UniProtKB/Swiss-Prot annotation:
Gene responsible for this protein: gatA
BP GO annotations: translation
Highest rank taxon of the organism: Bacteria
UniProt entry tagged with the keyword Nucleotide-binding: yes
Gene3D superfamilies associated with the record: Amidase signature (AS) domain
Protein keywords: ATP-binding, Ligase, Nucleotide-binding, Protein biosynthesis
Record's function text: Allows the formation of correctly charged Gln-tRNA(Gln) through the transamidation of misacylated Glu-tRNA(Gln) in organisms which lack glutaminyl-tRNA synthetase. The reaction takes place in the presence of glutamine and ATP through an activated gamma-phospho-Glu-tRNA(Gln).
Entry GO terms, CC: glutamyl-tRNA(Gln) amidotransferase complex
Reaction(s) the record says it catalyses: L-glutamyl-tRNA(Gln) + L-glutamine + ATP + H2O = L-glutaminyl-tRNA(Gln) + L-glutamate + ADP + phosphate + H(+)
Stated name of the protein: Glutamyl-tRNA(Gln) amidotransferase subunit A
UniProt lineage: Bacteria, Bacillati, Actinomycetota, Actinomycetes, Acidothermales
Active site: 80, 155, 179
Amino acid sequence: MSDLIRRTAVELAAMIAAREVSAEEVTRAHLDRIAAVDPAVHAFLYVDADGALTAARAVDARLAAGERLGPLAGVPLALKDVFTTRGMPTTCGSKILEGWIPPYDATVVQKIRDAGIVILGKTNMDEFAMGSSTENSAFGPTRNPWDLSRIPGGSSGGSAAAVAAFEAPLAIGTDTGGSIRQPAAVTGIVGTKPTYGGVSRYGLVAFSSSLDQAGPFARTVLDAAYLHAAIAGHDPRDATSIDAPVPDVVAAARNGDVRGLRIGVVRELDGDGYDPGVRHQFHQAVKLLADLGADVGEVSCPHFEYALAAYYLIAPSECSSNLARFDAMRYGLRLGDDGTRTAEDVMALTRAAGFGAEVKRRIMLGTYALSSGYYEAYYGSAQKVRTLIIQDFAAAFEKFDVLISPTTPTTAFPLGERVDDPLKMYLADLDTIPVNLAGNAAMSVPIGCSPDDGLPVGLQIMAPVLADDRLYRVGAALEAAYRERTGRLLIEDVPDPAANQEGAA
């Protein structure tokens, strides 16, 4: 295994800037890694080797000409296949968009290109970001590098697995109900959901417009901070984009001092239904934060218990509206258009064949919740619960600077275990959904492996709107303490998928 793929993004960027190694060499090392392990992991749906090498050579040429480039110039990145990309397919993990190549770049993609970051390709995901295991992809599941018989989380499981398998040092995902934080937790890496509106949604194919948010994956808190800073900022093309200064997340990640910080442990996000191993690691981390000088206490957010139910009314309702645009008329799959059928028949045939079971389930849920006889009873009530959750957060943040909880109730579960039990699958996002409903910022940081099964456990840090820097301050402190205690990062213990393909067949 090349030493280059084991380097952090910050280390690689420094080496490239000092011309100790070329961006092309770094890119080739990661392309070689993808070729070696992705047949087992299946993190990528599309690898753009030619485009990546061209972008890397351009960085090398600009450095040779004496240009000063961004802090991540030349560093490779994996991109969730939910962003429009000029010259690359965008499928959203769905047959209905198979082969579609958009004519424009999403704002996040343009910012990545402008920063000189090298896009390796597009990663696998649950279809239209609907799922918690990446098993809902129309193109097959992604596998967890820690155990190839288990899920990598979802819906951004491909991006998380790519980083955990050392196929890319950085990745971009999206988080609607936990789809960055939950995969990060079960693959032993760092994942951040920025404040809603802090990163542009222009060109992000919408699942739930009031909840979707793009964010970074990385193997270290500092790497995640640099990527967060690169993609954040106001975008006039996104009506929900916040026109406010981006919090200095990089400085916070370099600080990592929690002395005097008030940290609230959310009472409702613990207890029955949580794996004993997850609870053990979480409570060890709580004690560690207190030992590091934080002022740790318990806080109650009583309406969090209704968050899951509210989310599964609000998100499907928005999904049923957003996915109406996939009508077989202008782009994507079109079936039955032989001159004998009406446009309505073509649309029905295409949507029946193009959408998977989970997408159809959520469209039906949303359509029902928005129907005239049930709108107020279901969708209207869910929005009232959302307001109560926002109020819970506001009250908690009057007493505490950040809140913490386990990121997920369990470690990574076996592939296939919950496919036929939607409710059990939905419970994977129990801890993460409240943040999306409120629009706050949150991060998952690894805190060790469960003593029960040896799989990674994540701790979730939650901060107020536009206080994203607090996430990085706490995350960096935990990461540094873990490294001091063990002598390494947790992700350094991940098995090599190339040598451990049992269960991948």
